[in-house]
Amino acid sequence: MSEVIEKAKRAKQASFKMALSTTDDKNEALQLISQAIINHKQEILTANALDIEEGKKKGLSEAVIDRIRLNEERLQDIADAILQVTILTDPIGEALEIIEKDNGLFITKKRVPIGVIGMVYEARPNVTVDAASLAIKTGNSVVLRGSSSAIESNKALIQVIHQSLASSSIPKEAVQLIEDTRREVANQFFQLNEYLDVLIPRGGKQLIDTVIKQSTVPVIETGAGNCHVYLDESAKVEMATEIVLNAKLQRPSVCNAIESLIIHRQWFEDHGLELLKTMQSHDIKIHGDSVVMEKFPPAIKAVERDWEKEYLSSEISVKIVDSVSEAIDHINRYGTRHSEAIITENKMNAEQFQLQVDAAAVYHNASTRFTDGFEFGYGAEIGISTQKLHARGPMGLEALTSTKFVISGSGQIRE
């Protein structure tokens, strides 16, 4: 039996035990994991250094290296995120609806675990812990398939998780890592309908498209982040500048960073050159349309692929439009339905943008960088869904549950 089938089978068996776990059981396990990550930080960082070294040898970009990189601060953030999950209300067992029939039947619609969640993700080792913690809290098993670029980090984290679970009431088999990172193993993983209830890809567009095309397991699509900020005609200059710089530069390699800036023509005429010079002074490489090129020659001429590209670095495309409607049309054509922002003092334009833009999160006068489970109060997230069925936006605890009808009677039969 192959590794992937064997581990998926173990996870499936563990999921039935997980269904009996109490909130206290789950929280105790998460507290143990959080503390163990801090206690074993040196082993984790040593493993991470191997991934970083190997990544540099392979010529991975600095953006990818940053995604792989762990340090004491990031490990503390990971541990804190786990503790945040422990204080969240456990959704499992919640009665969503109670119906009492005339014949005496009690029908209760309850929130229950999904069962076994398959995760496919790229360079971020923090996803290993995020996915495990959310799965445990919601009574699910999880099978993780990360990238070869972070395999040593993932193995070290899973070892810490398993050691912690061994001291808890939660079966360690509920969290599995596929260590074989070959593509053919991934393809096998995508078709384990017998063991997996859902598959969640988390990464770039190519990974997500591959999973959607090849998977026979139901998929929750977490989209790439080709996010936009639109500066409307009435946008305040200082606010617009601060939001653009934050949304682009605070952490360029993440999915809620902006990749494209859209500017109303009048605003651009009045303030555009000043903004572009400020962006250039922050080492942002600008790809502009013909209007931008005319006013700011240092820019690079934007081509079609720039409007749909997720740079994941200090690069940005800039387009000039004549109206909020034109900005919306551009976003709906090239965006990835993730996070979009409008900066404006015009309430009607803000409302039009919020209603017509097709995205999981739509902002008015705020940075797109807030699209995050922790920022939204969900604790660690398993991904940001850009589809419209089952879950949309940051996927916290409730997104990892299903429902079950529990019917209690006293001998009723249907006549």
Swiss-Prot record:
Cytoplasm among keywords: yes
Ranges in a coiled coil: none
Listed Pfam families: Aldedh
Lineage: superkingdom: Bacteria
Keyword entries, A-Z: Amino-acid biosynthesis, Cytoplasm, NADP, Oxidoreductase, Proline biosynthesis
SUPFAM superfamilies from the UniProt entry: ALDH-like
Location(s) in or outside the cell: Cytoplasm
Gene Ontology terms for molecular function: glutamate-5-semialdehyde dehydrogenase activity; NADP binding
Pathway: Amino-acid biosynthesis; L-proline biosynthesis; L-glutamate 5-semialdehyde from L-glutamate: step 2/2
CC terms in the record's Gene Ontology section: cytoplasm
InterPro entries xref list: Ald_DH/histidinol_DH, Ald_DH_C, Ald_DH_N, Aldehyde_DH_dom, G-glutamylP_reductase_CS, Glu-5-SA_DH, GPR_dom
Catalytic activity: L-glutamate 5-semialdehyde + phosphate + NADP(+) = L-glutamyl 5-phosphate + NADPH + H(+)
One Gene Ontology term from the biological process aspect of the record: L-proline biosynthetic process
HAMAP family listed in its UniProt record: ProA (MF_00412)
Summary of the function given for this chain in its UniProt record: Catalyzes the NADPH-dependent reduction of L-glutamate 5-phosphate into L-glutamate 5-semialdehyde and phosphate. The product spontaneously undergoes cyclization to form 1-pyrroline-5-carboxylate.
Family in the record: Belongs to the gamma-glutamyl phosphate reductase family.
Record's protein name: Gamma-glutamyl phosphate reductase
Organism: Oceanobacillus iheyensis (strain DSM 14371 / CIP 107618 / JCM 11309 / KCTC 3954 / HTE831)
